[in-house]
Amino acid sequence: MATIPITKRGAEKLKAELHKLKTVERPWVINAISEARAQGDLSENAEYDAAKDRQGFVEGRIQEIDGKLSAAQVIDPSELDAGGRVVFGSTVELEEEETGERVKYQIVGEDEADLKLGLVNISSPIARALIGKEEGDTAVVQAPGGLKSYEIVAVHYI
């Protein structure tokens, strides 16, 4: 199985979700199924059906997270020393060359990506354009509105 890069923070979030699923959600679902069974006829028992559906979701999510964590290559950006080069986990300050607008992104794994928080997926067009570049370089990105050029103002490993 191929390794999946994930930041330390992303791995901690997945572990916290897994813990909640195993210690809160799973016991709740088991109890809900037990209570629904106690009501008698299961063939027309909506509570039982809903609890079984929830159980399927919870167990599926537990397996999914377990799989991701077992294949994860956890990277702590604060321990990186890439000499100003953009790598997975780095935080990059950019200036859009046409408008002068400044943005800051951290390059993260698929499960961590949230553009509103400035977290971009390693396989996104902007991350692919930035990887390997250094401070002062220009990255050209194919955006929905056309090509955009960004100057890399700073690269941080935080």
Predicted regions and their residues:
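Helix-rich terminal scaffold detector
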Residues: 1-63, 158
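Flexible, active-site-adjacent loop/turn segments at secondary-structure boundaries
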Residues: 2-4, 40, 72, 86, ...
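Non-DNA-binding regulatory cores of transcription-related proteins
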Residues: 75-158
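Acidic side chains
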Residues: 17, 41, 49, 53, ...
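Structured, basic alpha/beta domains of bacterial-type, RNA-associated proteins
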Residues: 59-79
